[in-house]
């Protein structure tokens, strides 16, 4: 999800205007980040991370994300252990209420969610890049592109994230949000290419293959 974030936001960008000004092609991303960034200049200079966050490295386990949550972000509403009560179980699965409560105050653009839903307890990725509209067809197409591409890239022998630096993925994300379909992004073996060319010549076919493997008619 992180590796394709730049491409995803570039092809689906749909919020170029904010308060009468033309800003980024997907202005929702910088506006949301700035609107809840309470860090002072001193804290920024000290390296304190913003709560709206793309991340800073590839991870090997979802536990890495929850560990980062604890390491980098203090609770917004701290509660003493004596007031927390006994650990809650949802069937055979731990409820982890406070883990989820804390996780919900950190707005990653791809956020891991632990859902203790009884027999269907699971961990999923909440992809928060998808904009609204402009039409239902656009929404469905953007979602299909994302799911198909994630599936296809995840099935590759050598995953894309092993060939693309995290720094490059972050630059792609910013470029896609800023410049939309006119952005240029970095991609393994191709170097820096126009995102429209990358999507049309390479990624749409991969997304179709991924959807086909999920028995989705394209």
PLM region spans:
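Loop-rich catalytic cores of soluble enzymes, especially ATP-dependent carboxylate-amine ligases
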Residues: 1-131, 157-161
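Electropositive phosphate-/nucleotide-binding environments in soluble metabolic enzymes
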Residues: 103, 140, 197, 201
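Glycine- and acidic
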Residues: 125-134, 186-192
């Amino acid at each position: 999800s992180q590796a394709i974030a730049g491409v995803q936001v570039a092809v689906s960008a749909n919020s170029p205007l904010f308060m009468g000004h033309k800003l980024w092609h997907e202005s929702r991303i910088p506006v949301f980040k700035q609107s809840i960034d309470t860090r002072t200049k001193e804290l920024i200079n000290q390296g304190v991370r913003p709560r709206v966050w793309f991340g800073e490295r590839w991870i090997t386990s979802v536990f890495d994300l929850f560990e980062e949550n604890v390491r980098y972000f203090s609770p917004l509403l701290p509660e003493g252990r004596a007031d927390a009560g006994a650990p809650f179980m949802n069937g055979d699965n731990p409820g982890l209420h406070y883990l989820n409560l804390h996780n919900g105050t950190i707005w990653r653009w791809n956020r891991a969610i632990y859902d203790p839903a009884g027999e269907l307890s699971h961990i999923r990725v909440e992809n928060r890049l998808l904009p609204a509209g402009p039409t239902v067809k656009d929404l469905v197409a953007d979602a299909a592109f994302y799911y198909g591409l994630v599936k296809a890239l995840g099935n590759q022998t050598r995953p894309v994230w092993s060939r693309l630096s995290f720094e490059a993925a972050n630059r792609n994300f910013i470029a896609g949000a800023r410049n939309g379909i006119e952005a240029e992004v970095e991609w393994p073996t191709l170097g820096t290419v126009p995102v429209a060319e990358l999507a049309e010549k390479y990624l749409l076919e991969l997304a179709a293959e991924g959807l086909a493997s999920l028995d989705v008619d394209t």
